[in-house]
Amino acid sequence: NYNLKYNMESITEDYYLPLKNKINEIEQVFEKLNIKFKSFIDNPNHYDRTFFVSSGLGWQGKSTMMLTPGSGPWQLLATIYVDHAFEESKNTNYSCGECNLCQISCPTGALNSEYKLDSNKCISYWLQSPELIPYEMRDAIGNKFYGCDDCLTSCPPGQENNNVVISVSYTHLTLPTT
């Protein structure tokens, strides 16, 4: 009898699919309006976190995750560069304040420094890595077989909405011509 634990991301085969579908809808509108665009979803060559914070949608938490009021860390990010001006987002000054529940809940101490993740101590990192899991991590991993959401589930802004939320932010940039 095994009691295996999994993280929220593993529930669907492609947990980015709802976001990809929404971005596809937006791209179709841009195509009809003849607006040039380039989108990025979960692309390691694009740092969408910078645009997330500057858009005013939320902030980087002490867990290093991007947080929004009401949803906390439970969202996926995408960025669309467009050759069109949009109304500028109101930049709000969010923060975690004195909260450190993500750091306290991390079973391996991967979040001992605020706003920094030590990936060598992160269960999710090792369970998704193609490398051999270090011996010293095996006890901490225990019965988790696909990631660890302890830092996410402890985050107060996301306590009521532990699901994927689709948010769209527009940042005015000009696309280079190719």
Question: Positions of the model-derived regions?
Answer:
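Iron-sulfur cluster-binding cysteine motifs and their immediate structural context
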Residues: 101-131, 141-168
